[in-house]
Amino acid sequence: MKTSALFVIFGLVLLFCNSFAAELEMTGRGCGGLMAGCDGKSTFCCSGYNCSPTWKWCVYARPGRR
């Protein structure tokens, strides 16, 4: 019983560390990914994305899109 409780706690700690590392990697970049907020002046989208003038977030770049 004690062993299974320790495994559950250990699993939750690993899950928390993994999500924290992913969030740190995401915010550490100087550009925004899909649906990240942007304004085109101080915050920019990563390559492959364009800043939507209507919604002010990054969307997939495709031919014909401004």
From Swiss-Prot:
GO cellular component, one term: extracellular region
Positions of post-translational Proline amide modification: 63
UniProt entry tagged with the keyword Secreted: yes
Domain notes: The presence of a 'disulfide through disulfide knot' structurally defines this protein as a knottin.
Entry's Gene Ontology molecular function annotations: ion channel inhibitor activity; toxin activity
Tissue/organ expression: Expressed by the venom gland.
Lineage: Eukaryota, Metazoa, Ecdysozoa, Arthropoda, Chelicerata
Pfam families linked: Toxin_12 (PF07740)
Cysteine pairings via disulfide bonds: 31-46, 38-51, 45-58
Note: Several genes are coding for U1-theraphotoxin-Cg1a for which the structure by NMR has been determined. The cross-references to PDB can be found in entry JZT7A_CHIJI (AC P0C2X7).
Cellular localisation: Secreted
Species for this entry: Chilobrachys guangxiensis (Chinese earth tiger tarantula)
Keywords: Amidation, Disulfide bond, Ion channel impairing toxin, Knottin, Secreted, Signal, Toxin
Signal peptide: 1-21
Family in the record: Belongs to the neurotoxin 10 (Hwtx-1) family. 46 (Jztx-7/10/12) subfamily.
Name this protein carries in UniProt: U1-theraphotoxin-Cg1a 2
Propeptide, chain numbering: 22-29
InterPro entries documented for this protein: Huwentoxin-1, Huwentoxin_CS1
Functional summary from the UniProt entry: Probable ion channel inhibitor.
